[in-house]
């Protein structure tokens, strides 16, 4: 079995049960590994047999990724796709099980995650105007992450039907095609409603994407949102700014405010507590440093009926 054919079969196999987002991830990142094999062995992928892939080649690929200067977390993200592909090849009998022997992911980065402060969020908000389509759209995107804990992919896939303005909640199809419900706070509700009414010909029952490229009906992509953040990082002067930091800030602020860990797990869409518990540490760290972490709307912490 040659590498190109194995790659094609791998994608067909995973398309039967993986989300579209996961397939895009595998297609891009496994292709990087396939290109590496082609460069190292001096042949096209359809001329390379899977059984020539060695443990040494796999370690060389990991070494090349480390040489890019990316953080360990990013390197592990790229390398994970190659490992999944190789495990598929091993299970199908295309290559030896020895190729992944003692090949481990890199240790997690030790750099602390510092949630955004109230002052920093004010700086971010000040970079946009609610009076323009672009500004209002971007504010909605930012506060979906900051006030609802959305991932970047959640923002892109949110539809008209996923917003319930009457009952104040959002429904999103997240990782693994799992649906979850998140509370819609007043500030975010107002911004979303104005954006949809003014710029998106909003009808509650339709399944159209909420966000579009400015002046068009073309849906935004994850790449276009990343470009917004790249510009925002320069303009705001917040060097550590990236989309997932806003989700971290939401979760940390929820814990600091006295939020329930089980509620947080459900809102973030985590399958277990292992990842969610990280925010207990971040919350304690922020308290210890007397950090003025961005505060969520008080409605998140109302008690009683």
Task: Give a label for each model feature.
Residues 1-305:
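Conserved catalytic core of the tyrosine transesterase superfamily
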